[in-house]
């Protein structure tokens, strides 16, 4: 088979795919090795890292095979392989090594080599050490609807930093996996490019650095540290609120990094326009790239998390027990992991098999608090107060949008936060049919992923109800 088939295939893909997608994922690839096998052919394509390989397999492999088959006049199978890479330079004997445990915030990752000076800016910065939490990777992150968009965007950045979605702003409640996701990007890039300059830190560490350098009048050191990065990962930028000097220095670093096409990923508990006491210059830039939310995990995702985490702990959890725990622990991944540890510890100490009865006993305090706090009546009152309508409107037949909308939101929350069935919820909303409740649940649930304002309102209501 002619080697020209691959170049012709790329030319066709360039016309069929959006330009940015083609330039990000297809153009940088080396030419495929084409082997004729009689009635069929194999195109071996070597991809530089696991993340690009998985993404190309899931998003483009079928399209590539179709184009190559058409050009070759016979079926072509795409064989994706990881490209061999030279081992990175050995660290000096006195360089700290990663121990795999969570590390203190604000640590350097990777050092630029002289051979890569064109790609990475050198600066008089501290000697880097590999201090990311190596356990927080894409492989250990359980995917689901709640984190689908954020995970997809993070994979894009890991595969092609500085190209698209810059900055990437990830927001959501406590314990939903934002930190895990940005560590995963850092670990992915570090594995692909060991000489990249990467820095993960919490916003409070940046504030501390600004204060320290302000006191010492050493702002050149601050610039050398932050302006020379290839990837900045910063958690909880809402902590910058009201700190004008910190915001000024972060703005300068932000502009310097974007100018050199370094990538910035931030997390927050709210979307950019919802950040209080932060300069509009910053929030407008936060919003200029891609803003994505991580939602509380849905039931199936919670079950998957429990099953995966329990396997890692070496004590697999039966599926029926995982469903029981997942139905009763809804807030976030952190609480879910806490519940799992309680169940596993209880089983270990009591030397009993893990079953629903044991899980109920292990979590009795948690279940008691939840049952006492979240009821349909409490939801109705909380939602009515939030939207400034009467509680009686929840049961009435009134249909103006100012009443119908909060009523649908209350039905949605009743389904999400209680164990009530659809008919039971309908009965508590003035004897409505279960199909009415189902419509409300689907409508609000569907809009939540698209409507930032609605999502924020629901987040506030959920946090209020859960105490």
UniProtKB/Swiss-Prot annotation:
Location of the region described as Domain II in the Swiss-Prot/TrEMBL record: 74-130
Gene3D superfamilies according to UniProt: 1.10.1750.10, 1.10.8.60, 3.30.300.180, P-loop containing nucleotide triphosphate hydrolases
GO (cellular component) term, any one: cytoplasm
Coiled coil (UniProt feature): none
GO BP term, example: regulation of DNA replication
Compartments reported by the entry: Cytoplasm
Keywords in alphabetical order: ATP-binding, Cytoplasm, DNA replication, DNA-binding, Lipid-binding, Nucleotide-binding
Region of interest (Domain I, interacts with DnaA modulators), residue spans: 1-74
Gene Ontology molecular function: ATP binding; ATP hydrolysis activity; DNA replication origin binding; lipid binding
InterPro entries assigned: AAA+_ATPase (IPR003593), Chromosome_initiator_DnaA (IPR001957), Chromosome_initiator_DnaA-like (IPR020591), Chromosome_initiator_DnaA_CS (IPR018312), DnaA_C (IPR013159), DnaA_dom (IPR013317), DnaA_N_dom (IPR024633), DnaA_N_sf (IPR038454)
Residue ranges of the region described as Domain IV, binds dsDNA: 348-467
Subunit comment: Oligomerizes as a right-handed, spiral filament on DNA at oriC.
Its job: Plays an essential role in the initiation and regulation of chromosomal replication. ATP-DnaA binds to the origin of replication (oriC) to initiate formation of the DNA replication initiation complex once per cell cycle. Binds the DnaA box (a 9 base pair repeat at the origin) and separates the double-stranded (ds)DNA. Forms a right-handed helical filament on oriC DNA; dsDNA binds to the exterior of the filament while single-stranded (ss)DNA is stabiized in the filament's interior.
Domain topic, free-text comment: Domain I is involved in oligomerization and binding regulators, domain II is flexibile and of varying length in different bacteria, domain III forms the AAA+ region, while domain IV binds dsDNA.
Similarity section: Belongs to the DnaA family.
Name this protein carries in UniProt: Chromosomal replication initiator protein DnaA
Species whose genome carries this gene: Methylibium petroleiphilum (strain ATCC BAA-1232 / LMG 22953 / PM1)
Gene name for this UniProt entry: dnaA
């Amino acid at each position: 088979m002619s080697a020209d088939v691959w170049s012709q295939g790329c030319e066709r893909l360039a016309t069929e795919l959006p330009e940015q997608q083609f330039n990000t994922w297809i153009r940088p690839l080396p030419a495929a090795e084409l082997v004729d096998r009689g009635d069929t052919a194999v195109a071996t394509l070597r991809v530089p890292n696991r993340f690009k390989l998985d993404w190309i397999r899931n998003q483009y492999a079928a399209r590539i095979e179709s184009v190559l088959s058409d050009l070759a006049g016979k079926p072509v199978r795409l064989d994706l392989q990881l490209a061999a890479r030279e081992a990175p330079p050995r660290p000096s004997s006195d360089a700290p090594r990663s121990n795999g445990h969570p590390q203190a915030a604000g640590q350097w990752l990777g050092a630029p080599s002289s051979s890569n000076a064109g790609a990475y800016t050198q600066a008089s910065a501290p000697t880097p050490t590999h201090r990311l939490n190596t356990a927080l990777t894409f492989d250990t992150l359980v995917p689901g609807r709640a984190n689908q968009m954020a995970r997809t965007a993070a994979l894009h950045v890991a595969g092609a930093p500085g190209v698209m979605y810059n900055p990437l702003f990830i927001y959501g409640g406590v314990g939903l996996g934002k930190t895990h996701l940005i560590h995963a990007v850092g670990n992915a890039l570090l594995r692909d490019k060991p000489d990249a300059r990467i820095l993960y830190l919490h916003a409070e560490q940046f504030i501390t650095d600004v204060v320290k350098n302000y006191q010492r009048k050493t702002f050149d050191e601050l610039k050398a540290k932050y302006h020379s990065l290839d990837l900045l990962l910063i958690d909880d930028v809402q902590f910058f609120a009201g700190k004008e000097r910190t915001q000024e220095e972060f703005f300068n670093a932000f502009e310097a990094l974007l100018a050199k096409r370094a990538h910035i990923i931030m997390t927050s508990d709210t979307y950019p326009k919802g950040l209080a006491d932060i300069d509009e210059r910053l929030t407008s830039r936060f919003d200029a790239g891609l803003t994505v939310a991580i939602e509380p995990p849905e039931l199936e995702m919670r079950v998957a998390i429990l099953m995966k985490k329990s396997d890692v702990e070496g004590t697999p959890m039966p599926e029926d027990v995982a469903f029981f725990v997942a139905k009763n622990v809804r807030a976030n991944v952190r609480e879910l992991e806490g519940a799992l540890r309680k169940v596993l510890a209880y089983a270990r100490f009591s030397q009993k098999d893990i079953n629903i009865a044991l899980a109920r006993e292990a979590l009795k305090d948690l279940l008691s608090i939840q049952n006492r706090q979240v009821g349909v009546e409490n939801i109705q009152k909380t939602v009515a107060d939030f939207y400034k309508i009467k509680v009686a409107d929840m049961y009435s037949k009134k249909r103006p949008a100012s009443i119908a909308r909060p009523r649908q939101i209350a039905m949605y929350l009743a389904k999400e936060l209680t164990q009530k069935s659809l008919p039971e919820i309908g009965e508590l909303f003035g004897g409505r049919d279960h199909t009415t409740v189902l419509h409300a649940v689907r409508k609000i649930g569907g809009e939540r992923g698209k409507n930032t304002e609605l999502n924020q309102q629901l987040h506030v209501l959920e946090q209020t109800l859960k105490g």
